[in-house]
From Swiss-Prot:
The gene is rplK. It comes from the Bacteria. This is Large ribosomal subunit protein uL11. InterPro entries: Ribosomal_uL11, Ribosomal_uL11_bac-typ, Ribosomal_uL11_C, Ribosomal_uL11_C_sf, Ribosomal_uL11_N, Ribosomal_uL11_N_sf. SMART domains: RL11 (SM00649). Forms part of the ribosomal stalk which helps the ribosome interact with GTP-bound translation factors.
Length: 149
């Protein structure tokens, strides 16, 4: 017989640096899950990824206080900031204060958008890569990025 699911926890955790501090500790502790077990397993699975990359994770909690988790691909905004060169160690990048009003904070090309679409395809609600590119293009515009090409 399958285990009874008691709930889901959705978090965004930096790759390779999960620790029991908030937001992980309180979210898992509330459900009675072993926090350190999750942190070790998550860090082991994300060790090959770029350290600090935000990774969405869906944790399924079971009645016997065990859990499973599924890693998703990083958010589109992370890839767009990286492609536009906004994300640096010294100054964390942010989008435009007034998107769509003529002030752009960076530029991305269609080739970069299709590359991002290929990476995100399994997590997007799209049938084709072209539809995914259009969706990501909309995200880029709402962040104040100029799409070229």
């Amino acid at each position: 017989m399958a285990k009874k699911i008691t709930g889901y926890v959705k978090l965004q955790v930096p790759a390779g640096s999960a620790n029991p501090a908030p937001p992980i500790g309180p979210a898992l502790g509330q459900r009675g899950l072993n926090i350190m077990e999750f942190c070790k397993a998550f860090n082991a699975q994300t060790a090959q990824l770029e350290k600090g990359m935000p990774i969405p994770v869906v944790i399924t909690a079971y009645q016997d206080r065990s859990f499973t988790f599924e890693l998703k691909t990083p958010p589109v905004s992370y890839f767009l900031k990286k492609a536009a060169g906004l994300e640096t160690k010294k100054k964390p990048g942010s989008g435009s204060k007034t998107p769509g009003k003529g002030t752009f904070v960076g530029k991305v090309t269609r080739a970069q958008l299709s590359e991002i679409a290929e990476k995100k395809m399994k997590d997007l609600n799209c049938e084709t890569v072209e539809a995914a590119v259009q969706m990501i293009e909309g995200s880029a515009r709402s962040m104040g990025l100029q799409v070229q090409g």
